[in-house]
Regions:
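Structural preference for solvent-exposed beta-strand-turn elements
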Residues: 1-370
């Protein structure tokens, strides 16, 4: 096995595939990166849950395969000078040279590296990388970390003729994003759930460009193809929340506010809230005004934010982080807040145009004196 390539390109590929490498595994090969030099140079990382494979432009003089420990391999390449890296392998002994630097390290038998799952092409979705990245980033925060409901530790993908919808829920909040897509193949409509950990890596792989990203749904796995990189993940099985029924649609109070102004007010009041000093926000929706206050063991805080609309003096409590997460994710300068009572959810929507995002935050019961 022998090849040479640019240090920067190899370093980027190692960084990408390392995200799917097991830091500790009963299978030593899974702590490494599989290198395959054939018609092209491929690097693969796999932790039995998620696999990432990427192709690196390289001059391949001799074909071969080998597994190298991801941490050491990454450290070596990162510290090499910015020059052409030459890689030679004789059985499991690897020689790496770049400029005046030279390393000889031991690799692992590639036969010990499990094969990535094969994803049968059942249904496919094509959309821009920028759009997919934004949709994931604006819903991933609401994925549950509660393993008692494994299905909600991932995001629901729903595709139909209207486009792609991604939904995340964690029992306290719901995040939904909808966008038109470039192409859909397969069934008229289909859905699947992707683990949040895998989606976090997809978000990193995607760039803010109009280049296409492809999502392929298989029977048990799903594949994301982004440029020269692909990610394979198992699908989560189970019954996802019937989210349409969970969203209140006949709210009696509608107010409109500036997203940044709302965030700034909540952020200021939240300064006296911490993990050790937890307290809900007391939000009072008056005529054209939102009053926000809280009280903890170290003191109290109060702020006001202008709104458009009459809240009728409704008083409701919220977890400050959940409300801020929703507002930060909202891809709009202004948002519409819909409420009904102090014990019903708050729904955050666009002020006009297509309803391409929706966030729902459940209230927190307020105690006297809070």
């Amino acid at each position: 096995m022998k090849f040479s390539c640019e240090k920067a390109l190899l370093q980027a590929a190692i960084s990408t595939t390392s995200r799917a490498v097991s830091p500790k595994s009963s299978i030593p090969a899974l702590e490494g990166i599989l290198l395959e030099a054939g018609n092209e140079l491929r690097l693969t990382g796999y932790n039995l849950e998620t696999g990432i494979r990427t192709v690196v432009p390289a001059d391949i003089q001799q074909e071969g395969t080998l597994v190298l420990g991801a941490r050491l391999f990454g450290d070596i390449i990162r510290k090499l000078p910015d020059d052409i890296v030459t890689f030679r392998a004789d059985h499991y002994m690897v020689n790496i040279t770049c400029g005046m630097s030279e390393f000889n390290i031991l690799g692992t038998d590639p036969e010990e590296f499990p094969e990535l799952p094969t994803v049968e092409y059942q249904n496919t979705i094509t959309l821009s990388q920028a759009k997919l990245r934004a949709m994931i980033g604006q819903t991933l925060f609401a994925v549950s970390d509660n393993e008692s409901r494994p299905i909600h530790t991932g995001s629901l993908f729903e595709a139909d003729d209207k486009g792609l919808t991604i939904v995340s829920v964690d029992g306290y909040r719901l995040a939904l994003r909808h966008e038109a897509i470039d192409k859909k193949e397969g069934a008229e409509s289909f859905s699947f759930v992707v683990p949040g950990a895998a989606l976090s890596e997809v978000e990193k792989i995607c760039s803010d460009v109009d280049e296409p990203a492809q999502i392929i749904q298989g029977a048990r796995h799903v594949m994301f193809k982004v440029g020269s990189t692909m990610l394979v993940s198992r699908r989560l099985e189970g019954e996802f929340l019937a989210y349409r029924q969970a969203i209140p649609r006949n709210n009696t109070i509608h107010v409109v506010g500036d997203t940044r102004a709302l965030l700034a007010s909540i952020d200021r009041v939240s300064l006296i809230i911490s993990d050790k000093l937890k307290s809900p926000l007391r939000c009072t929706f008056d005529h054209n005004l939102l009053k926000i206050s809280t009280k903890t063991a170290i003191g109290d805080a109060y702020d006001e934010c202008p709104l458009e609309g009459d809240g009728g003096g409704l008083e409701i409590g919220f977890n400050n982080k959940y409300l801020m997460d929703a507002l930060k994710a909202a891809p709009a300068d202004r948002v519409r807040l819909e409420l009904t009572t102090g014990v019903s959810p708050c729904v955050i929507l666009p002020t006009e145009g297509e309803e391409n995002f929706l966030y729902m935050v459940l209230p927190v019961r307020l105690k006297a004196g809070e």
